[in-house]
Amino acid sequence: MSTIRPVFYVSDGTGITAETIGHSLLTQFSGFTFVTERMVFIDDAEKARDASQRILAASERYRVRPIVVNSCVNPYLSVILAESGALMLDVFAPFIGLLEHELNTSRHSRVGRAHGMVDFETYHRRINAMNFALAHDDGVAASYDEAEVVLVAVSRAGKTPTCIYLALHYGIRAANYPLIDEDLNSDQLPLRLRPYRKKLFGLTINPERLQQIRQERRPNSRYAALDTCKREVAAAERMFSAERITTLSTTHTSIEEISSKVLVTLGLQREMF
């Protein structure tokens, strides 16, 4: 059996739902090379037939049955896609019938509900949170009064991506503060952070992994040297311990997991967008 499998994320909208669920499923299987392709805005029969032909062509090219992760809400489009002979994984079908029975009503299919601008107020909050994260990145803001969380870590430990994820997916006003040499000379929190102790969450990282990341940014620099990374990480961890700041290692932790831990630790109740 071939270890190369073509995978198509097919959607009548942005494809975010299909790709997110599909990626989560595929990561459960090792030993395979998944060649993925996104097919988005497949919202009529003509587009569905074209997609089906492309999937069929992949079957012939790779000589193996493709996998289709489908989030199209129109069942007719799903039927057309199935003509490709691919393994069809419909992300809604297993649950819609159960929910219709439980709620005693039929679904109202609408493209883009999962990630569209269905609720303007919610969408506006998300955009504001994103702008906040960008304006409060890397300690550039003078105050964290409006922040709901302030991530603290040495440079390149995952602060910015996590803040952006919290903003986009939860509407959280997330700021971050980079620990510099001046801060790391003491086991006490920097003066700027002390008024916001209850909002702080520390990120740490394996020095070897940090060195790899920094090497990509500034090759062969003092900034990327392993001894620099070891010194900074050790100093940051001493500070977090002394100040009793909750921490999490980002070395083998996804942004999704980091964000969930932050929300739980700080008691931030917010539905995912």
Swiss-Prot record:
EC number annotated for this UniProt entry: 2.7.11.33, 2.7.4.28
UniProt-annotated binding residues for ADP: A153, V154, S155, R156, A157, G158, K159, T160
Catalyses which reaction(s): [pyruvate, water dikinase] + ADP = [pyruvate, water dikinase]-phosphate + AMP + H(+); [pyruvate, water dikinase]-phosphate + phosphate + H(+) = [pyruvate, water dikinase] + diphosphate
MF term (GO), any: ATP binding
Record flagged with keyword rRNA-binding: no
Protein keywords: Kinase, Nucleotide-binding, Serine/threonine-protein kinase, Transferase
InterPro entries: Kinase-pyrophosphorylase, PSRP
Disulphide bonds in the chain: none
Pfam families named among the record's database cross-references: Kinase-PPPase
Highest taxon in the source lineage: Bacteria
EC class (word): transferase
UniProt record similarity statement: Belongs to the pyruvate, phosphate/water dikinase regulatory protein family. PSRP subfamily.
Job of this protein: Bifunctional serine/threonine kinase and phosphorylase involved in the regulation of the phosphoenolpyruvate synthase (PEPS) by catalyzing its phosphorylation/dephosphorylation.
PANTHER family: PYRUVATE, PHOSPHATE DIKINASE REGULATORY PROTEIN 1, CHLOROPLASTIC
Family annotation (HAMAP family): PSRP
Protein name, UniProt field: Putative phosphoenolpyruvate synthase regulatory protein
Native source species: Xylella fastidiosa (strain M12)
Upper taxonomic lineage: Bacteria, Pseudomonadati, Pseudomonadota, Gammaproteobacteria, Lysobacterales
